[in-house]
Design a protein with these regions (language model features):
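Two-component histidine kinase catalytic core, primarily the HATPase_c
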Residues: 44
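Phosphopantetheine-dependent thiolation modules in NRPS/PKS and related acyl-activating systems
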Residues: 2-40, 49-50, 54-85
């Protein structure tokens, strides 16, 4: 299984966010909050996490799902990086 570097993680996460939230790449900044800045709700968060699991071959725990809407984009990068180890 391929391990993705940070740059690849950021690009793939950004692609998923743009696709699932219908936003532009210019909206996706590391310090943007998923709910407050990007308009993600809890259903969006589940959809995003399911896609990330497929893209990165990882399993995301329920605890991470519950905190997803209040986290920043950079937190999502960190989560993926941590879970693929």
């Amino acid at each position: 299984m391929k391990k993705f570097n940070r740059q690849e993680i950021e690009k793939k996460v950004n692609d998923v966010l743009v696709d699932k939230l219908g936003i532009g790449y210019s909206d996706v900044k590391p310090d943007a909050q998923l709910e407050q800045d990007l308009g993600a709700d809890s259903l969006d968060a589940v959809d995003i996490l399911m896609e990330l699991e497929k893209e990165f071959y990882i399993t995301i725990q329920d605890d991470d799902i519950y905190s997803m809407t209040s986290c920043k984009v950079s937190d999502v990068y960190d989560l993926v990086e941590r879970l693929q180890k």
